[in-house]
C-alpha cells in the first residue's frame, strides 16, 4: 500500500516506525538483515525475480534501500500503492551517508559494501549500480567519497522520482514535518503520540559496528 522511493539516510527508520504506528508493517533494510534477504535482492537486481512481491509477505509498506531503488517495478506490481519520497537537504544527506552507510573507512563500512558478508557485498554492488549512474548510463566513479557528486546524485534521484510518479500518488516528505502531511496522504487519523525520531548518525554507526562484531 505504501512504496518508499526515498534514499537511505532520509529518515527512513523514523518513517518506518511512524508507518507501523499507523498500522502499516514496514519493510526496511533492517528486514533484509533479519530475514537474510540479501541474496534475493542481488538476484532481483541482476536477473530479475519471479515476483517482486515475494519479500514483502506480511508487510503493507516498504522504505529505505534496497527496495527504494526498485520503486518502478514495485509501482507496477502494486498499481494502487501510494509513493513516499522521503528527503532532506542534500548536503546533510551526503555528510550522513559518508559517515555511515557508504563510509570509506573499513571499520565502519556499510551493510551494502560489507567485506564480512559476501551476500551483502553482492547485493550492494547490484543496487548501487542502479543508483550510481550518470546521465549517460555509466557508473559515476568516485561518487561514494565525494560530497558534491553524492549531492548531485541525490538531487538527480529525487528529480527522477518526481518525474516518474503521478503527483496524486506521491508525497514528498521530510520527517521534520511530523504526522500531519503523512496522515493526510494516507487518509488515517493523526495518532496521539509523538512522531518517532530514531536512527540518527551516531546510532547508525553503532549498528554498523555491531554488525561487524557479529559477523567477524
Where are these regions (language model features)?
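Short beta->alpha connector loops
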Residues: 8, 65-69, 176
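PAPS-dependent sulfotransferase catalytic domain
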Residues: 20-24, 31, 72-149, 188
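PAPS-dependent sulfotransferase catalytic core
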Residues: 1-56
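Active-site rim elements
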Residues: 58, 143-151, 167-172
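The conserved 3'-phosphoadenosine-5'-phosphosulfate
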Residues: 31-39, 84-94, 111, 156-215
